[in-house]
C-alpha cells in the first residue's frame, strides 16, 4: 500500500510540474489568449486563422522610424471587420523621438479601441531607439492618446532598463511585451515590471514548421510571431485596449 501511495504521489507531482504557468510554457494554458503580431513580410490566411478560437487579437507593425508598413491599413480594416481586437507597434530607431511618435500616430490614428506599442529591439543606440529617447516617445504617446504604450523588449533590453532607470520611471507605467523564445523564463528581472503582459514566445527563431513549433496557428507560417497573454481570453477581451 505504501509503495502504491508513493507511486501515486510521484505521478501526481509530475503532472503538477508539467502544467503551464506564468513563466513556463504559458501558451499551453488553453484558457490563455493568443495574439499575432505580423508585419508586411508575413502571409496570413484569415479564413484559416479563424479556426483557432484562442487567437483574439492582432498587434501589427505600423511604422519603423519614418517608414510605413505597406499592409498595415488594409489588414487593420479586414481584421477588425472579422472581430479581432487590434493594436499597432512602432519600431523605434535613433533620431527625434517626438517626430517618430507623431509619425506613428499619423498612421495608426488615435483610436480608443486600439493598443499602442513601442518596439525597442536592442541596446545598441546606433541601430535602435535609445532609452532616453524611448522615455520621450512614451510620454508623447501618452500626451496624445491618454494611454501608455506597451513596451516590447527582449531580455537584454529589459535588463538594461532595470539597470539604468528606477522604479518610478515611465517604463513602469507601460505594460511589458516580453520577447523570450524558450519554454521557461527562470531569470525574469522584476525591478521595473513585476510581470509581463504579453510573452512573445514563437518566431522564425524557434518555429520552422508545424511539427517543430511551440504553437501553430492555422493560416500562418513559421516566421509569424506569436504571443500569449498573461490572462484568459475573456480577460483580454474585457480589458482591451487597457491590457
Model-found features: residue ranges?
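Bacterial Sec-dependent signal peptides at the C-terminal "C-region" and cleavage site
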Residues: 11-22
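Functionally critical loop-and-helix segments that line ligand-binding/catalytic clefts
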Residues: 20-37, 42-46, 52, 167-243
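Catalytic domains of cell-wall/extracellular-matrix polysaccharide-remodeling enzymes
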Residues: 115-191
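Sec-dependent N-terminal signal peptides
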Residues: 3-13
Amino acid at each position: 500500500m505504501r509503495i502504491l501511495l508513493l507511486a501515486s504521489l510521484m505521478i501526481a507531482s509530475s503532472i503538477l510540474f508539467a502544467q503551464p504557468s506564468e513563466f513556463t510554457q504559458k501558451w499551453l494554458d488553453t484558457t490563455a489568449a493568443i495574439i499575432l503580431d505580423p508585419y508586411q513580410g508575413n502571409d496570413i490566411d484569415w479564413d484559416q486563422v479563424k479556426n483557432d478560437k484562442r487567437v483574439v487579437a492582432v498587434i501589427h507593425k505600423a511604422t519603423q522610424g519614418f517608414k510605413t508598413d505597406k499592409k498595415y491599413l488594409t489588414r487593420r480594416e479586414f481584421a477588425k471587420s472579422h472581430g479581432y481586437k487590434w493594436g499597432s507597434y512602432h519600431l523605434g530607431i535613433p533620431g527625434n523621438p517626438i517626430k517618430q511618435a507623431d509619425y506613428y500616430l499619423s498612421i495608426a490614428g488615435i483610436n480608443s479601441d486600439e493598443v499602442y506599442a513601442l518596439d525597442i529591439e536592442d541596446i545598441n543606440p546606433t541601430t535602435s531607439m535609445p532609452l532616453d529617447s524611448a522615455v520621450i516617445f512614451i510620454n508623447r504617446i501618452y500626451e496624445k492618446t491618454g494611454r501608455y504604450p506597451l513596451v516590447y523588449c527582449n531580455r537584454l533590453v529589459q535588463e538594461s532598463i532595470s539597470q539604468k532607470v528606477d522604479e518610478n520611471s515611465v517604463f513602469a507605467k507601460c505594460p511589458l511585451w516580453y520577447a523570450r523564445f524558450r519554454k521557461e523564463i527562470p531569470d525574469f528581472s522584476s525591478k521595473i515590471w513585476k510581470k509581463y503582459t504579453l510573452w512573445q514566445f514563437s518566431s522564425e527563431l524557434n518555429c520552422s514548421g508545424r511539427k517543430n513549433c511551440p504553437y501553430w496557428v492555422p493560416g500562418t507560417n513559421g516566421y509569424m510571431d506569436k504571443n500569449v497573454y498573461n490572462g484568459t481570453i475573456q480577460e483580454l477581451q474585457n480589458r482591451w485596449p487597457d491590457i
